[in-house]
Amino acid sequence: MTRHGIVLGFTLSAGLAGAQAPDYDREMRDLASRPEIQKAFEIIVELEPQTEKDLIELTEIPAPPFKEEKRGIRYAEMLREAGMPDVEIDAVGNVITRFRGTTGGETVAMVAHLDTVFPEGTDVTVRREGNRMLAPGIGDDTRGLALMLTVVRAIVRSGVKTRGDVLFVGSVGEEGLGDLRGVKHLLREGGPKIDQFIAVDGGSTDRVLNKAIGSYRYKITFKGPGGHSWGAFGLGNPAHALSRFIYHFDEEAGEFVITGPRTSYNIGRIGGGTSVNAIPFENWAEVDMRSEDPEQLGRIDAIMKKAVDRALQEQNERKRRGDPLTVQVELLGNRPSGTVDPSTPLIQRALAATRHFGVEPQLETGSTDANVPIALGIPATTIGRGGEGEGAHALHEWWSNVDGHLGIQKALLLAVATAGIAE
């Protein structure tokens, strides 16, 4: 998960609502005052020790990129234990269960991701320092998984009935090179019907995402014959070509991102070569480019590819002998972008649900599982998992249960409001 710039949601939503718009704040007050919802809220508070136990157990099951299976199997078991008899693990590893509505109305998906960014072998043992629990991945997004389990328990035990179905999903492949593969599969043509989408990701209870940051990720590999640094001197050098590419890309992209919709670029990793005294046979770099705007992303993508071509041409012109260098441009990831109009009922309900708990909401931009439905035109948002925490994607990541129950109550209220309460 990635979180970016903040806009005050209260001011924006109030301005857009207008005199004729539905009163979503009143809708939330009325819904929250119903006996079954009040009971669900009480159950959430009573389940705080169980929620913490779930969080620790799941955190200590490693879920590196592309290796979420063990955690997914256990999460499916936990959903069954929470009261959902029909749980499936789909072809790519998503864990899915359906809370059935009474009328077959719109289907709402609530999604938290199973995977973490940490490689295999990372110590994920949870330890305590005061009120903090520390472990890689404990917040992002294991807390989201624990939150959903408690939402399920509270709905089942309280007797809440919804008009539409609520699909609870533990997704795979949200992080890094996973490229949102779990949600892309979930929303494939012929997949389960999903009309609205709520991702649970990110730390703060005030979070309401309505803009999805798109990204391209590439591996750029320059290749040549390679040889001895003395005896084969004069051959085209892939390392030199890679250096030229990085220089030219940074020069033009650095100017490009100064204006227009927010856009970023990064050379995150470079590698290649075999020895200090050997001309490499290949050198590579991994490139990440992001933007709030699809057209802007396309433009910086073109700048990157132009820099590749220029570097290849220049280095081949400099070689004194041997075959020309070649280059391979491999697309590693393509995260779609888009925007949900703040006046959309789902966004308005998310803002109102946040205000209901005395928190001023923030409209945000980010890169989450919600990117996919937003790009497909499905109303979608990402809300925070509650509590307090820092250090996402770092070994020192921590989470603390400071009013963490409010994040769970908000998630339940939003899910039920979106699916519709059955009378």
Q: Across the structure, where does each feature detected by a protein language model lie?
A:
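Alpha-helical metal-binding/catalytic segments enriched in His/Glu/Asp
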Residues: 62, 110, 114, 128-177, ...
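Acidic-glycine-rich active-site phosphate/pyrophosphate-binding loop
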Residues: 115-128, 209-221, 352
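Acidic/His- and Gly-rich active-site-bordering loop/insert found
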Residues: 22-134
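Bacterial N-terminal signal peptides
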Residues: 5-15
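Short glycine-enriched loops at secondary-structure junctions
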Residues: 113-117, 203-205, 212-215, 270-273, ...
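Acidic/histidine-rich catalytic neighborhood of metal-dependent amide-processing enzymes
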Residues: 132, 137-213, 257-258, 264, ...
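Metal-dependent amide/peptide-bond hydrolase catalytic core
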Residues: 20-39, 55, 239-423
